[in-house]
Structures are given as structure tokens and as C-alpha cells.
């Protein structure tokens, strides 16, 4: 699975849930996307990668 596919999946999930709670959905999606990027790129855990564990 490519990185852009992971983004697409997470964004679709956020749009489906956005009717109930847009702000909570955006926060959850942001965390999911940042974790996916960190795991994929195996970045040094700094800043945006702090929740990659």
C-alpha cells in the first residue's frame, strides 16, 4: 500500500464520520495520517512524529 492510498483511506473515514463530529473527526484523521507517514517513512520521532509509537 502506498502512502497516498493510506491518506485516501483515512480521509474517506473522516468524511463519513464528519456528520457527527467534524472537529473530532479531523483530529482523529490528523493523528492517523501522521502515524501512517511516520511508520512509512520511518522518520526520526520529532515534532509531528511524536505520536508514532
Curated annotation (Swiss-Prot):
UniProt GO molecular function: signaling receptor binding
GO terms classed as biological process: cytolysis by host of symbiont cells; defense response to Gram-positive bacterium
Modified residues (2,3-didehydroalanine (Ser)): 25, 50
Free-text description of this protein's post-translational modifications in UniProt: Maturation of lantibiotics involves the enzymatic conversion of Thr, and Ser into dehydrated AA and the formation of thioether bonds with cysteine. This is followed by membrane translocation and cleavage of the modified precursor.
UniProt KW keywords: Acetylation, Antibiotic, Antimicrobial, Bacteriocin, Lantibiotic, Secreted, Thioether bond
Modified residues (N-acetylalanine): 24
Main localization of the protein described in the UniProt heading: secreted
Highest taxon in the source lineage: Bacteria
Modified-residue entries (2,3-didehydrobutyrine), positions: 29-30
Entry keyword annotation includes NAD: no
Single GO cellular component term: extracellular region
Keyword presence, Acetylation: yes
Cross-link Lanthionine (Ser-Cys), sequence positions: 34-38, 48-52
Localization (cell): Secreted
Family to which the UniProt record says this protein belongs: Belongs to the type A lantibiotic family.
Function: Lanthionine-containing peptide antibiotic (lantibiotic) active on Gram-positive bacteria. The bactericidal activity of lantibiotics is based on depolarization of energized bacterial cytoplasmic membranes, initiated by the formation of aqueous transmembrane pores. Lacks antibacterial activity against Gram-negative bacteria.
Record NCBIfam families: lanthi_I_FDLD, lanti_ElxA
Name the UniProt record assigns to this protein: Lantibiotic paenibacillin
Gene name tied to this protein: paenA
Amino acid at each position: 500500500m502506498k502512502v497516498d492510498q493510506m491518506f485516501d483511506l483515512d480521509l474517506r473515514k473522516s468524511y463519513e464520520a464528519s456528520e457527527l463530529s467534524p472537529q473530532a473527526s479531523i483530529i482523529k484523521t490528523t493523528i492517523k495520517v501522521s502515524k501512517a507517514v511516520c511508520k512509512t517513512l520511518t522518520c526520526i520521532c520529532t515534532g509531528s512524529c511524536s505520536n508514532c509509537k
